[in-house]
Amino acid sequence: MYKLVASDLDETLLADDHHVPGRVRRAIAAARERGVRFVPCTGRPADSVGVTLEELGLAGSEKNYTLSFNGGCLTRNSSAEPLTSCSLPFGRACQIYAKGVREGVCMHVNTLGPVYLYNYVPEERVYIQGRMNIVETTEPTLDFLAGQTVVKIVFMSLSMSHLERIEKSMRETGITEGLDVYYSGNRYLEFNAPGVNKGAGLMGLAARLGIAPKETIAIGDNSNDVSMIRAAGLGCAVANATDEAKAAADYVCEADNNTGAVAEVIEKFVLGA
């Protein structure tokens, strides 16, 4: 019997309108009535998940959790105070930021407070408007955050080939050595602290709750979800997932994020079990 379902948000749990489809809400509610925990697991900051938690009836719950920053931060849904968190070495963060400035990309610099946006292009404004605590910056270096925690840095481009070229260059010059680097959302290249991934975050939470790995389900769509898809007892990829995510999965959904993929998994493996 599965006791915990962890799901990515964007392009997995959420439809393209950034809301949870009704079928998915009903399936999650039914699973919770059976005592199964539902855990959002996102690359975004925890404070960007509030609307989703409200839609799922999980907001303010002391007994429920959210994994954010690709599993690098664990919070109770009743508090913004992290139970666990990780950070990039500041020197490495400075190198990544400098590369982003040279490349002219839009950058998210995630802290335990605001998300600092460099080169905040119109396409990104439309995409994330109202979902994060944003502070715009034009600073040419990361010195303005000296002494603060930088959780991760994200490069944004609508050209994945552009991001792939940048990542290859950074790998060849050693800037990303030892870091956990992922693509997500078909527009992001994410740089995380060593050992930070959704799989590790999920297994850490399961251990905290006394849940065995084989009793967990993970659902995702992109490269930053692969670690939890592999780590879970049942790893699932939505129909709109990347080939990499589908190859890692035990089960590939017929439905995509708009037609209730998360509900499909819960109905088949939790409610139908």
List where the protein language model places each region.
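Asp-based phosphoryl-transfer active-site loop
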Residues: 2-16
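Active-site phosphate-binding/coordination module
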Residues: 22-124
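Short, well-ordered alpha-helical microsegments
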Residues: 46-50, 163, 225-226
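Conserved acidic, metal-coordinating active-site core of Asp-based
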Residues: 99, 103-219
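Mg2+-dependent phosphoryl-transfer enzymes with acidic/Ser/Thr/Gly-rich catalytic loops
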Residues: 1-4, 21, 190-273
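Active-site glycine-centered loops adjacent to acidic/histidine catalytic or metal-binding residues
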Residues: 8, 42, 221
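Conserved SAM-binding loop
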Residues: 13, 38-41, 66, 155, ...
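Short, structured coil segments at secondary-structure junctions
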Residues: 56, 62, 70, 177, ...
